[in-house]
UniProtKB/Swiss-Prot annotation:
Originating organism: Brevibacillus brevis (strain 47 / JCM 6285 / NBRC 100599)
Record: residues binding glycerol: 83-84, 135, 244-245
Amino-acid positions noted as binding ATP in the UniProt annotation, renumbered to this chain: 13-15, 266, 309, 313, 410
Family under the similarity heading: Belongs to the FGGY kinase family.
Regulation: Activated by phosphorylation and inhibited by fructose 1,6-bisphosphate (FBP).
GO MF, any single term: ATP binding
Protein name listed in UniProt: Glycerol kinase
InterPro entries: ATPase_NBD, Carb_kinase_FGGY, Carb_kinase_FGGY_CS, FGGY_C, FGGY_N, Glycerol_kin
Keyword Kinase included in the entry's annotation: yes
Keyword ATP-binding: yes
Record EC number: 2.7.1.30
One GO process term, biological-process aspect: glycerol metabolic process
Length: 499
């Protein structure tokens, strides 16, 4: 039976998905399941790692069943995942010692402050390309070892394993045979040296994490192992891994230096390919590994915006201003401007390029004339302003002026937002026909490893732009709006939460 399809497992922050692709990169089928978000304390976010696995397995089986595809028709599996989210489990029982600590979760903030006080910031920056922040896995692992009873002793005895979600899923899919991650995920842990491409002893000592917990680190496109035959009575090759944002960069075919994409999801993530050189940021961006493919490692600059789509979800769930997120577009178009209203959605602090953990959300410019339409439009516009903040930092670091921005993620269906994004950047914005670029990137990585696609050229040839948005705003209007945003951000950062 021929290998007809590639299968992507896309394990996201709010749902687990399985997507089937054909040779042209078209979607054959999708199955999705949401899972529980756990909020033990303000600012803390956790997931049940077993529920993540069960939901992922369920959608994997469902997408095959619903599309009448047999396991032996799958050429390979690619895995892409919410990055930084941390699982620690017992290697003998396979049971997690605690809930997974999610990337957004701030519970290791005190550990970060201690590390800064101890003077580790420069070392971390140089070796990992990251900042000391509760966002990254390393401080989450330390928090678990410090707070779960008996965990440190078990870890030191070699009984515990750490993994980001890709590692956890592969461990489960192979029934505990394979403990592995790829360069892109390893580069988000605070424990991996992105220049020497290995776990770094100095960083591990800083975090007091035993090396025996850590997975092997491999390129993003190679054979890692096979699914356990008890799962499907057929062993499917697992051949691609990338963190969700790097996978989207690959899925958008941003293979050349200076090409960039922005993903509009719960958060917003912009990545620019910088080729085989790790560009150190002077403007609050992260230097990260894009992927290891074809025997070489390529790097990216990344700007992480913590709250993007989550601001629209808040309008829906918190304020009950809209019934569904897509309603935001008609409200935004019901007014010509926000009438001077700016929303800075710093619900969990501000990410790139500000990195202010203490900032909280704010709305400025309210008058008696402000309506829900103005508020909703301001929330949408905040996504575009934050993207410009990041792009300006990226252009300054890389010395490259972006010619066009490739976009993907849930919010790109919003034509108002995409046009405003193009206007505020004064840059072409391209929306692809296949919006599932994260899953597509994982499929491409796996497909290259198993020979389903011959080369990156095949991938470039697959790409179809569904719609292009061109700037259509007078420059003085653009600069005036953006100046107002900068003022709002400065004011937001001036207001500190009281503990």
């Amino acid at each position: 039976m021929e290998n007809k399809y590639m299968l992507s497992l896309d394990q996201g922050t709010t749902s687990s998905r399985a997507i089937l692709f054909d040779k042209s990169g078209a979607i054959i089928g999708v199955a999705q399941k949401e899972f529980t978000q756990i909020y033990p304390k303000p600012g803390w976010v956790e997931h049940n790692a077993e529920e993540i696995w069960e939901s992922q397995l369920e959608v994997l089986k469902a997408v095959l069943l619903e599309n009448h595809v047999k396991p032996e028709e799958i050429a390979g599996i690619g895995i892409t995942n919410q990055r930084e989210t941390t699982v620690v489990w017992d290697k003998h029982t396979g049971k997690p010692i605690h809930h997974a600590i999610v990337w957004q979760s701030r519970q290791s903030i005190d550990i970060c402050n201690q590390l800064k006080e101890q003077g580790f910031e420069q070392t971390v920056r140089e070796k990992t390309g990251l900042l000391i922040d509760a966002y990254f896995s390393g401080t989450k692992v330390k928090w678990l070892l410090d707070h779960v009873e008996g965990a440190r002793e078990r870890a030191e005895k070699g009984d515990l394993l750490f993994g980001t979600i890709d590692t956890w899923l592969i461990w489960k899919l192979t029934n505990g045979l394979v403990h592995v991650t790829d360069y892109s995920n390893a580069s988000r842990t605070l424990m991996f040296n992105i220049h020497s491409l290995e776990w770094d002893d100095e960083l591990l000592n800083m975090l007091q994490i035993p090396k025996s917990m850590l997975p092997a680190v491999r390129p993003s496109s190679e054979m890692y192992g096979y699914t356990d035959e008890k799962l499907f009575e057929f062993q499917i090759p697992i051949a691609g891994i990338a963190g969700d944002q790097q996978a989207a960069l690959f899925g958008q075919a941003c293979f050349a230096e200076g090409q960039a994409k922005n993903t509009y999801g719960t958060g917003c993530f912009m990545l620019m390919n910088t080729g085989e050189k790790a560009v150190a940021s002077k403007n609050g961006l992260l230097t990260t590994i894009a992927w290891g493919v074809d025997g070489k490692v390529e790097y990216a600059l990344e700007g992480s915006i913590f709250v993007a789509g989550a601001a629209i979800q808040w309008l829906r769930d918190g304020l009950k201003l809209i019934e569904k997120s897509s309603d935001s577009e008609k409200h935004a178009l019901a007014v010509d401007t926000t009438d001077g209203v700016y929303m800075v959605p710093a619900f969990v602090g501000l990410g790139a390029p500000y990195w202010d953990m203490e900032a909280r959300g704010a709305i400025f410019g309210l008058t008696r004339g402000t309506t829900e339409d103005h508020l909703i439009r301001a929330a949408l516009e905040s996504l575009a302003y934050q993207t410009r903040d990041v792009l300006e930092a990226m252009e300054a670091d890389s010395g490259i002026r972006l010619q066009k921005l490739a976009v993907d993620g849930g919010a790109v269906a919003n034509n108002f937002l995409m046009q405003f994004q193009s206007d505020i950047l004064n840059t072409e914005v391209e929306r692809p026909r296949v919006n599932e670029t994260t899953a597509l990137g994982a499929a491409y990585l796996a497909g290259l490893a198993v020979g389903y696609w011959g080369s990156k050229e095949d991938i470039v040839n697959n790409k179809v732009v569904e719609r292009s948005f061109s700037p259509d705003m007078a420059d003085e209007v653009r600069q005036g709006l953006y100046a107002g945003w900068k003022q709002a951000v400065t004011a937001t950062m001036g207001y500190k939460i009281r503990h």
